[in-house]
Amino acid sequence: MTKQLLTQKYTNDVQQNSQKHFGYLTERMYSYRDKVLDKKPFIDAERAILVTEAYQKHQEKPNVLKRAYMLQNILEKMTIYIDDETMIVGNQASSDKDAPIFPEYTLEFVVNELDLFEKRDGDVFYITEETKEQIRNIAPFWENNNLRARAGVMLPEEVQVYMETGFFGMEGKMNSGDAHLAVNYQKLLEEGLIGFEKKARKAKADLDLTKPESIDKYHFYDSILITIEAVKTYAERFAILAKKQAKTANAKRRQELLDIASICEQVPYYPAKTFAEAVQSVWFIQCILQIESNGHSLSYGRFDQYMYPYVKADLEAGRETEDSIVERLTNLWIKTITINKVRSQAHTFSSAGSPLYQNVTIGGQTRHKEDAVNPLSFLVLKSVAQTHLPQPNLTVRYHANLDKSFMNEAIEVMKLGFGMPAFNNDEIIIPSFIKKGVSEEDAYDYSAIGCVETAVPGKWGYRCTGMSYINFPKVLLITMNNGIDPASGKRFAPSYGHFTQMTSYKELKEAWDKTLRYLTRMSVIVENAIDISLEREVPDILCSALTDNCIGRGKHLKEGGAVYDYISGLQVGIANLSDSLAALKKLVFEEKRLTTLEVWQALQSDYAGPRGEEIRQMLINEAPKYGNDDDYADSLVRECYDVYVEEIAKYPNTRYGRGPIGGIRYSGTSSISANVGQGRGTLATPDGRHAGTPLAEGCSPSHNMDKKGPTSVLKSVSKLPTDEIVGGVLLNQKVNPQTLAKEEDKQKLIALLRTFFNRLHGYHIQYNVVSRETLIDAQKHPEKHRDLIVRVAGYSAFFNVLSKATQDDIIARTEHAL
């Protein structure tokens, strides 16, 4: 039955054959997967009520203690449950896939959208009248009393215009925690929370309280001790519940529940001794971190590296078989999909599909520069293939000597058509990290975080990626309009001349440089103001305790407790910028086939009028395009992008000089689905794009402008300064499943990837292996495609939960042949 049901989600023989290769879920895990996916996501007010209780009771205490008591109150009182099918326990909300509310960050959008959650075009949530009433009851306490309110007043007057118009896309950052990191799971498994507790106690005892800085450290250490005890209590509650359920269970389930109880009495407080304990310990923390904070991209790190010793020992001792390990892994991945987050309607435009970006990284190299692939690496691939879910977000670290059979298996998973794994390239990422100040040993130990971002797990500060999303095409329009945003009519930058008065491309380029530098500075001001607010208002204690060197310094993450602290700025619409510049330079300034006035009027009318469409077709068809290995277009965007790389590096982050190595900014192109949201507010652009339509995502070419095949795309991307875009270079590609039908086709793709990574120094690539026809049919008949998963940007999502605008954007992507 399982085999029959699981193959129904595939529409072609290629994917069915790949599924046969990896095998199928066990009956219990298939049942569990089905149960979770069938569950409607509801808004859950329980956490919000418990947070309100704690904040009211501990109002006078320092924020680190208030946050510790908050988590304690939640973990001691929240609803817990153990599903019949699961071997792993721990829940984020009152029911699977329900979304808890985080009023200490914001409650404003929740209250405003109470009657709208079920009416959304995408990212729909359900809500009961009782929950609405509960939220309304606590709302007065949080009015002007949370992160969003305080961050809002922290913003200087000079940047208010960008917030009012949504230019920087800061909705997520003002409503959420930071996250974007992986804690030190290896140390957790080896030492248990008791090890962190001992360090905090010793550090507290060693303080000289006559030193002013020791007072804050004293309270920070106390908050860690309270938090660790709360986590211990949470695990013990599950041990008690498991024993209770065992009394009425059948013999087989009774023993399993008693085993669960024993495991929960051991971890995460004490070190893990077995694979089952290690998985449970990691899941407890992964889950609780997302109860403590609503920041996303809390990633598992290098799962196959820190977990393999337990797998190896259990296999050798006969405690586990490969099949039992795979089943427990599939259980973990299904638990991972139960975590949920509700975003404001505005935020969903840049994070479509309710993603949590919980990344698992496998492969790569060891700290000693050897191939890190081990037997667990293969089992992770197999388990992810069997579960066929958008979470976890699976990344393979590629390097020149990567095990060939492992690479083959990774491509087999990719053929299943759910957008995984993505590939990150050691050959460019490791040298880039070392260049920025990361030790060689740590650079070799990096993992993917969230989408395509990278960091050293357990040693990196919050938010290795930016959140301001500088809209490059809109910056160009502002540049052309003498510093005024043509959409809002508001001044965004100083006057550097109007496009209609320019007589050369050089003038336009000089104005671009000045405008981009100015707006980059403004984005830094916005991010700093919000970062300061995050530091003061919502310190995350558990997350800090599990990140080196927070206990050693006596500082939480936002104060500069981590070993490293780098963040990136993000950009949207790189390809639109390239194609626009190429069209303007060639058709206006070089060939003079169009005047500046004609182009400007066409843009302002969205290509309406007598010559509007004619001009649009000229811009589209008669100028070079990025993605075709054309130096004309590729060099223009490189020149303009270099300005951003140079400018963003000038500005340290708020942790600079406070302990961590780094404290600086660099570039990144991981724009997730912001290309759709940002496109909504961007007028027509000189590449022929209509107003309000999506921009190009990541560093991928504009849809259907890449005419010369995948190799040309890779060559164009490689001309970007990838060694400086350390925050991630997001490249999406799409191929028809039939393109990979034969073994020789798969080997062609592997050869293409090796060329991209070894010779062209590509940073990242990911594939949608799905046909346009399947996507169109899924849009028309969603009930037939419940399991259809697509790669949106640096993450995958169920196609049916996406808004129509995001679905259309994915359908429109170029479909390549090899």
Can you describe what each PLM-predicted range is?
Residues T2-Y221, K252-D259, Y270-L818:
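Conserved catalytic cores of very large enzyme subunits
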Residues E236-A239, K243, V524, V645:
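Structural signal for well-ordered, non-membrane alpha-helices
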Residues K204, K232, A239, K243-A246, ...:
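Heptad-repeat amphipathic alpha-helical coiled-coil interaction surface used
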Residues D222-E236:
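Extended non-globular scaffold/tether segments
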